[in-house]
């Protein structure tokens, strides 16, 4: 190993005292004696640096933990050795110059930055661009800062308070703008020099001196907005602010909570409560919280993202802090620390808004004494929302009630999308265009489930007239004639069980029922609810009924309910199925008549259901959907053969009805389809289905309903225990 000392990385030119990299010492001879700004290589001289702006991975992690607002956005990382060459100290203000642009920042040491280079946190200057960094000299402290603001937002005291917090401990130069984000929108702030300062600085180099003058905001300074430019035009700074939350449509419960626990206490000079608010996207959370910020203007600080929360780091001006974030991840330690700091300040009221309360750490949740969920709007809330947005889209007032009735599951955002789409939809009238647009919009409230208003009518189900009437009495009558039930002092059924052989239209009946009743239809199959993760199956049941209540009136259809509701202690049951059944029973007990949620279940094996599920108050009615009788078979066959041509239509249908005794509805449909396939097999151009084709189809499709199943249904109907 050589004993020679390693050459220093930086060398000082003996002629001009410029500091350059050792490898650039020869190239420096071409620029020796010239101003630093003309150098094409990195160098430092007399407090001025000429070097490249480079990228540093996770640069914000090298900043001091209390760097927030302007200080964070305008920090400049620089090597400690480079700082010593320039005679700079940490957090000292410097001017960055690139082309015709210049701005003020503060330096902070970082060993990851190469010698004679800088890493500017702001994206104002692109990476790998040559910049000039120079010290600012004397800085004037200001107790009052006058600015002009350019933004598309309404200027109000809330924004003024945010700017005061953001520009705290900042270094600025007059007529040089600062760009920032507020409520997700761009805001450009330009410091304006007082007229007295302009007059005192008048001289030969007036403009140059004023533009290079650096000022700093003192502790407790005040900001004054001179004028506001909104979308390029000048307007009054402060506009009329709302006094309550009546401008926001819907959200009745959440609005009342905020009025009672936040707004009223503030006006009465009392301490407000911290509130946790959550709800689906498009439900109006952000709109509501922005309105709260306007109502309590001057007392609030609005934080619209985790990034803003981390920037402010708990430093806010108002005593009401609104934190509007979609999700607060546990891994985001800096945001969690900032929120914890806010909640730990007894003088502050925190309104936290998230998408789901379940994802919030329990340590935070217990610190909110009041919680409010913004649910999917009810009919009255939808009507209120339409009254607020109808004028925007020129939607007639007389149609508001009709639209509100038929938009179950629509959030406020969905209703806006509906009226917007209706302007371009097909139809001669407003209502026709709205109905066309509604088919194209999937409501937010029902997206995560298979939920819809099915396009199936009673006419699509052949025969079964008595069965249809019985089901209508159990489901549709309570919706259309509630006064009749009140007159007799009885409650409508909470649940209905459809049982019978496979293929007898139980699912089709359920869909037609939802369509005729104009109710949402939420369909799940029993096995789909099971999960290998402990507790997930029970949570699926809870979520199912929770969403059903939100988008009521709803029919919750459980197909193959025997997979979930099998008798406890039987061979089919297991630990998971028993827990799921217990959760299902709990949810059924919690269904109040005012919830407008009906459980409709279907099974082929009613004998295997747990007796607790079948008691009155849960599955009140058990309706047998049996094999089609002669009249029903005729109706089904006539419906399925409408487009078929026969040699003798009447005789063919009569023969089919006679020969399909014991066939289910699905098997009758299969017979018709198979006969048509045999006709096409003989000739692809065939137009008539012969009786011989039906004979072949009857031989291929046979009745598969076993006799022991029919005995089970008879025993169940009579209340006898089955031996099967």
From Swiss-Prot:
<dbReference type="GO" id="GO:0042273">
    <property type="term" value="P:ribosomal large subunit biogenesis"/>
</dbReference>
<keyword id="KW-0143">Chaperone</keyword>
<feature type="binding site">
    <location>
        <begin position="281"/>
        <end position="287"/>
    </location>
    <ligand>
        <name>ATP 1</name>
    </ligand>
</feature>
<dbReference type="InterPro" id="IPR003960">
    <property type="entry name" value="ATPase_AAA_CS"/>
</dbReference>
<dbReference type="InterPro" id="IPR027417">
    <property type="entry name" value="P-loop_NTPase"/>
</dbReference>
<comment type="similarity">
    <text>Belongs to the AAA ATPase family. AFG2 subfamily.</text>
</comment>
<dbReference type="InterPro" id="IPR003959">
    <property type="entry name" value="ATPase_AAA_core"/>
</dbReference>
<keyword id="KW-0131">Cell cycle</keyword>
<keyword id="KW-0963">Cytoplasm</keyword>
<comment type="subunit">
    <text>Homohexamer; ATP binding induces oligomerization. Forms a ring-shaped particle of about 12 nm diameter, that displays 6-fold radial symmetry. Interacts (via N-terminus) with kinase air-2; the interaction is direct and inhibits air-2 kinase activity in an ATPase-dependent manner.</text>
</comment>
<dbReference type="InterPro" id="IPR050168">
    <property type="entry name" value="AAA_ATPase_domain"/>
</dbReference>
<keyword id="KW-0378">Hydrolase</keyword>
<protein>
    <recommendedName>
        <fullName>ATPase family protein 2 homolog</fullName>
        <ecNumber>3.6.4.10</ecNumber>
    </recommendedName>
</protein>
<dbReference type="InterPro" id="IPR003593">
    <property type="entry name" value="AAA+_ATPase"/>
</dbReference>
<dbReference type="GO" id="GO:0019901">
    <property type="term" value="F:protein kinase binding"/>
</dbReference>
<dbReference type="Pfam" id="PF17862">
    <property type="entry name" value="AAA_lid_3"/>
</dbReference>
<keyword id="KW-0132">Cell division</keyword>
<dbReference type="Pfam" id="PF00004">
    <property type="entry name" value="AAA"/>
</dbReference>
<dbReference type="GO" id="GO:0051301">
    <property type="term" value="P:cell division"/>
</dbReference>
<dbReference type="GO" id="GO:0004860">
    <property type="term" value="F:protein kinase inhibitor activity"/>
</dbReference>
<keyword id="KW-0067">ATP-binding</keyword>
<dbReference type="GO" id="GO:0016887">
    <property type="term" value="F:ATP hydrolysis activity"/>
</dbReference>
<keyword id="KW-0547">Nucleotide-binding</keyword>
<comment type="function">
    <text>ATP-dependent chaperone which uses the energy provided by ATP hydrolysis to generate mechanical force to disassemble protein complexes. Required for various steps of embryonic mitosis including centrosome duplication, spindle assembly, ER dynamics and cell cycle progression. Regulates the stability and activity of kinase air-2, a component of the chromosomal passenger complex (CPC). Inhibits air-2 kinase activity from metaphase to late telophase and negatively regulates air-2 stability during mitotic exit.</text>
</comment>
<keyword id="KW-0498">Mitosis</keyword>
<dbReference type="GO" id="GO:0005737">
    <property type="term" value="C:cytoplasm"/>
</dbReference>
<dbReference type="GO" id="GO:0005524">
    <property type="term" value="F:ATP binding"/>
</dbReference>
<dbReference type="InterPro" id="IPR041569">
    <property type="entry name" value="AAA_lid_3"/>
</dbReference>
<feature type="binding site">
    <location>
        <begin position="503"/>
        <end position="508"/>
    </location>
    <ligand>
        <name>ATP 2</name>
    </ligand>
</feature>
């Amino acid at each position: 190993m050589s004993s020679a000392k390693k050459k220093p990385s930086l060398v000082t030119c003996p002629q001009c005292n410029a500091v350059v990299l050792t490898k650039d010492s020869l190239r420096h001879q071409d620029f020796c004696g010239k101003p630093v700004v003309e150098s094409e290589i990195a160098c430092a001289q007399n407090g001025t640096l000429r070097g490249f702006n480079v990228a540093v991975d996770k640069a914000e992690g090298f900043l001091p933990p209390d760097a927030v607002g302007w200080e964070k956005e305008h920090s400049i990382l620089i090597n400690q050795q480079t700082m010593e060459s320039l005679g700079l100290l940490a957090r000292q203000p410097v001017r960055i110059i690139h082309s015709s642009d210049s701005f003020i920042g503060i330096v902070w040491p970082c060993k990851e930055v190469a010698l004679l280079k800088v890493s500017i946190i702001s994206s104002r200057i692109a990476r790998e661009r040559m910049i000039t960094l120079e010290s600012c000299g004397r800085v004037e402290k200001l107790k009052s800062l006058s600015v002009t603001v350019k933004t598309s937002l309404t200027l109000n005291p809330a924004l003024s308070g945010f700017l005061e917090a953001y520009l705290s401990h900042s270094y600025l130069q007059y007529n040089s703008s600062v760009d920032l984000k507020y409520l997700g929108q761009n805001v450009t702030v330009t410091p304006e020099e007082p007229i007295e300062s302009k007059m005192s600085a008048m001289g030969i180099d007036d403009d140059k001196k004023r533009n290079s003058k650096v000022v700093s905001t003192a502790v407790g300074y005040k900001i004054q907005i001179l004028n506001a430019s909104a979308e390029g035009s000048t307007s009054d700074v402060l506009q009329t602010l709302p006094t309550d939350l009546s401008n926001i449509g819907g959200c009745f419960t959440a609005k009342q909570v905020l009025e009672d626990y936040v707004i009223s206490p503030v006006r009465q000079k009392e301490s407000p409560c911290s509130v946790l608010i959550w709800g689906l996207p498009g439900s109006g959370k952000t709109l509501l919280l922005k309105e709260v910020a306007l109502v309590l203007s001057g007392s609030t600080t609005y934080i619209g993202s985790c990034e803003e929360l981390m920037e402010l780091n708990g430093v806010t001006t108002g005593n009401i802090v609104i934190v509007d974030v979609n999700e607060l991840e546990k891994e985001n330690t800096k945001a969690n620390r900032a929120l914890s700091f806010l909640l730990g300040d007894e003088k502050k009221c925190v309104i936290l808004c998230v998408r789901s309360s379940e994802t919030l750490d329990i340590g935070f949740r217990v610190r909110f004494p009041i919680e409010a969920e913004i649910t999917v709007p009810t009919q009255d809330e939808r009507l209120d929302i339409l009254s607020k947005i109808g004028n925007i889209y020129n939607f007639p007032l007389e149609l508001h009630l009709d639209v509100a009735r038929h938009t179950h599951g629509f959030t406020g955002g969905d209703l806006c999308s509906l009226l917007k789409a209706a302007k371009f939809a097909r139809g001669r009238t407003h209502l026709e265009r709205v109905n066309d647009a509604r088919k194209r919009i999937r409501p937010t409230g029902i997206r995560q489930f298979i939920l819809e208003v099915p396009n199936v009518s009673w006419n699509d189900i052949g025969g079964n007239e008595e069965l249809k009437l019985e089901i209508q009495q159990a489901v549709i009558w309570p919706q259309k004639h509630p006064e009749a039930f009140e007159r007799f002092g009885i409650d409508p059924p909470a649940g209905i069980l459809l049982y019978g052989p496979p293929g007898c239209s139980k699912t089709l009946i359920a869909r037609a029922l939802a369509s005729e009743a104009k109710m949402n239809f939420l369909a799940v199959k029993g096995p789909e609810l099971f999960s290998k993760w402990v507790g997930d199956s029970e949570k699926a049941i809870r979520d199912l009924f929770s969403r059903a209540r939100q988008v009521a009136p709803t029919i919750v259809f459980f197909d193959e309910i025997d997979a979930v509701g099998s008798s406890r202690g039987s061979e089919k049951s297991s630990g998971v199925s028993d827990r799921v059944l217990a959760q299902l029973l709990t949810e059924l007990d919690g269904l109040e008549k005012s919830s407008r949620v009906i459980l409709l279940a279907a099974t082929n094996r009613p004998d295997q259901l747990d007796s607790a599920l079948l008691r009155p108050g849960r599955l009140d009615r058990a309706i047998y959907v049996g094999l089609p009788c002669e009249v029903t078979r005729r109706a089904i066959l006539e419906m399925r053969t409408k487009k078929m041509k026969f040699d003798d239509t009447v005789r063919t249908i009569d023969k089919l009805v006679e020969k399909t005794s014991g066939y289910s509805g699905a098997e009758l449909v299969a017979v018709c389809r198979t006969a048509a396939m045999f006709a096409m097999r003989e000739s692809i151009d065939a137009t008539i289905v012969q009786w011989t084709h039906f004979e072949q189809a009857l031989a291929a499709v046979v009745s598969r309903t076993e006799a022991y199943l029919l005995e089970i249904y008879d025993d169940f109907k009579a209340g006898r225990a089955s031996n099967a």
